[in-house]
Amino acid sequence: MARPLGRVAALLLGLLMECTEAKKHCWYFEGLYPTYYICRSYEDCCGSRCCVRALSIQRLWYFWFLLMMGVLFCCGAGFFIRRRMYPPPLIEEPTFNVSYTRQPPNPAPGAQQMGPPYYTDPGGPGMNPVGNTMAMAFQVQPNSPHGGTTYPPPPSYCNTPPPPYEQVVKDK
């Protein structure tokens, strides 16, 4: 008889422990007085007598923060590893040829040449025909020291002052 009584007592004690551990006691204010209610252990109290099922992992903000940081780190590391293993091909740009000669210094301090400054052929004489400044400005340089494609020098209008404001307004 002592044996079944001990088993019954252990069973009742186990049920009592399970009932008290498996419930959360929650409360909220309704007006001036608190209202009490009970939720299960895997549910959260949400306020007005409702219990919300939630996994504990959803409440761990630092877990999700570290998970996202890990994903970003892996993506970044993968990007840099891919860039190192498969580098982009180097694009060889053609060399830009800017060979020109300057005007010779003026022989006399009072004598100046007429016309804008010009670019000359490195292999030929430097002449400035006053009437044909555009032809001289766009002259192609055949004896380029680099041997690549040659480009004409920039036009000579870069060194002239802009037109006055009144003239621009009058033209429109």
UniProtKB/Swiss-Prot annotation:
<keyword id="KW-0967">Endosome</keyword>
<keyword id="KW-0458">Lysosome</keyword>
<protein>
    <recommendedName>
        <fullName>WW domain binding protein VOPP1</fullName>
    </recommendedName>
</protein>
<keyword id="KW-0805">Transcription regulation</keyword>
<keyword id="KW-0968">Cytoplasmic vesicle</keyword>
<keyword id="KW-0812">Transmembrane</keyword>
<feature type="compositionally biased region" description="Pro residues">
    <location>
        <begin position="151"/>
        <end position="165"/>
    </location>
</feature>
<dbReference type="GO" id="GO:0019899">
    <property type="term" value="F:enzyme binding"/>
</dbReference>
<dbReference type="InterPro" id="IPR026229">
    <property type="entry name" value="VOPP1"/>
</dbReference>
<dbReference type="GO" id="GO:0031090">
    <property type="term" value="C:organelle membrane"/>
</dbReference>
<dbReference type="GO" id="GO:0031902">
    <property type="term" value="C:late endosome membrane"/>
</dbReference>
<feature type="region of interest" description="Disordered">
    <location>
        <begin position="139"/>
        <end position="172"/>
    </location>
</feature>
<comment type="subunit">
    <text>Interacts with WWOX (via WW domain).</text>
</comment>
<keyword id="KW-1133">Transmembrane helix</keyword>
<keyword id="KW-0732">Signal</keyword>
<comment type="similarity">
    <text>Belongs to the VOPP1/ECOP family.</text>
</comment>
<comment type="function">
    <text>Increases the transcriptional activity of NFKB1 by facilitating its nuclear translocation, DNA-binding and associated apoptotic response, when overexpressed. May sequester WWOX in lysosomal vesicles and thereby regulate WWOX role as tumor suppressor.</text>
</comment>
<dbReference type="GO" id="GO:0005764">
    <property type="term" value="C:lysosome"/>
</dbReference>
<dbReference type="GO" id="GO:0005770">
    <property type="term" value="C:late endosome"/>
</dbReference>
<feature type="signal peptide">
    <location>
        <begin position="1"/>
        <end position="22"/>
    </location>
</feature>
<dbReference type="GO" id="GO:0005765">
    <property type="term" value="C:lysosomal membrane"/>
</dbReference>
<feature type="transmembrane region" description="Helical">
    <location>
        <begin position="61"/>
        <end position="81"/>
    </location>
</feature>
<keyword id="KW-0472">Membrane</keyword>
<feature type="topological domain" description="Extracellular">
    <location>
        <begin position="23"/>
        <end position="60"/>
    </location>
</feature>
<keyword id="KW-0804">Transcription</keyword>
<feature type="topological domain" description="Cytoplasmic">
    <location>
        <begin position="82"/>
        <end position="172"/>
    </location>
</feature>
<dbReference type="GO" id="GO:0030659">
    <property type="term" value="C:cytoplasmic vesicle membrane"/>
</dbReference>
